[in-house]
A protein has these predicted regions:
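Amphipathic alpha-helical segments enriched in hydrophobic/aromatic residues interleaved with Lys/Arg
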Residues: 5-8, 116-135
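Conserved hydrophobic/aromatic beta-strand scaffold that supports enzyme active sites
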Residues: 58, 83-85, 106
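Conserved beta-strand positions that form and line the central face of beta-propeller blades
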Residues: 22, 93, 128-129
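Short acidic-glycine-tyrosine-enriched beta hairpin
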Residues: 72-87
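Generic protein-terminus/edge-of-domain signal
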Residues: 1-76, 98
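Short, charged/polar surface micro-motifs in flexible loops or helix N-caps
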Residues: 30, 63-65, 83, 89-91, ...
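Ligand-binding loop in jelly-roll beta-barrel domains
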Residues: 75, 89-113
Length: 135
């Protein structure tokens, strides 16, 4: 089941330096088709071909497991308690394990504030996965 919200930002909103474009959650049960139908145009992707976005997205997986790959990272296992960051213009693909599924929460965002953090080296496409745990 997927619940998501896509938000439209105005030029005035962008003056804050960070705008939110999407938030949501999804639970994929073992054996369920992925990606699920219902993604907005520009977000749906074929896991074999991957995609690029024009925003950052932070995804948190509190349950299950799967894999993630990007232009800077070969296929890497994602496990419960991991977060991973998608970078604008960076090719990527990910999907849950067909035998375990996963729960996922995400937020999409963009703006000068996050761009500055990346330029300063706080975040990098070479190291997009962090294990933060779960409760």
């Amino acid at each position: 089941m997927q619940t998501s919200k896509y938000l439209l930002a105005t030029e005035r909103d962008a003056e804050w330096g960070l705008t939110i474009s999407t938030v949501g959650r999804e639970e994929i049960v073992p054996g369920e088709e992925y990606p699920t139908k219902g993604h907005a145009d520009g977000y749906y992707f074929d896991i074999k071909k991957g995609r690029t976005l024009d925003e950052y997205q932070l995804l948190y997986q509190p349950e299950g497991e799967g894999v993630f790959s990007s232009a800077h990272l070969p296929e890497t296992k994602i496990k419960a308690g991991d977060i991973f960051l998608l970078f604008p213009g960076e090719w990527h693909s990910y999907h849950p394990s067909s035998t375990k599924g996963w729960k996922s929460y995400w937020i999409g965002f963009k703006g000068k504030n996050i761009n500055d953090r990346v330029k300063a080296g706080f975040l990098s496409p070479e190291k997009p996965i962090y294990h933060v745990g779960y409760s």
